[in-house]
């Protein structure tokens, strides 16, 4: 009898611990993390976006992925993870240190790192091209190309204050889009093909 109770308790704990269920990442906490990251990005604003109109650029955020209609659960989690990883890398460059208030930047990095750790416990293996529902394009490659375009833009603009402001606004947009995919995953229990 004690063994059966211990086994039941272990199963209950596994279902609530990281890696034990989809809910390990898609709980209320990540929504708070996203809000905090958006708040930090907003506070990092040093220039009026209107003063940088001439530097605006469409980076081609892959909407078909962040909307989630064409992704399976594992792919969606991998896309969320890759977008977080790339965002973390972007704000962890030497050039980003020169562009932002170091206290706010460090808080943002810490928040992104915590989200990466939380999501890493829940995602499955990275999906490859042959598993992709987006045709011949691997979703992870698409995310990497999107961020490479951002790095190229920053370099082309000499890491100017306006270039960083445009990228800051783009990261807020991308973070909001990622939240849409995350909410959809949570709502559908990971089945993105359900209504």
UniProtKB/Swiss-Prot annotation:
GO terms for biological process: defense response to virus; female pregnancy. Its main location: secreted. PROSITE patterns: INTERFERON_A_B_D. Keywords: Antiviral defense, Cytokine, Disulfide bond, Glycoprotein, Hormone, Pregnancy, Secreted, Signal. Constitutively and exclusively expressed in the mononuclear cells of the extraembryonic trophectoderm. It comes from the Eukaryota. Disulfide bonds join 24-122, 52-162. Coiled coil: none annotated. One of its GO terms (molecular function) is cytokine activity. Residues 1-23 form the signal peptide. InterPro entries: 4_helix_cytokine-like_core, Interferon_alpha/beta/delta. It is found in: Secreted. Belongs to the alpha/beta interferon family. IFN-alphaII subfamily. This is Interferon tau. It comes from Ovibos moschatus (Muskox). The gene is IFNT.
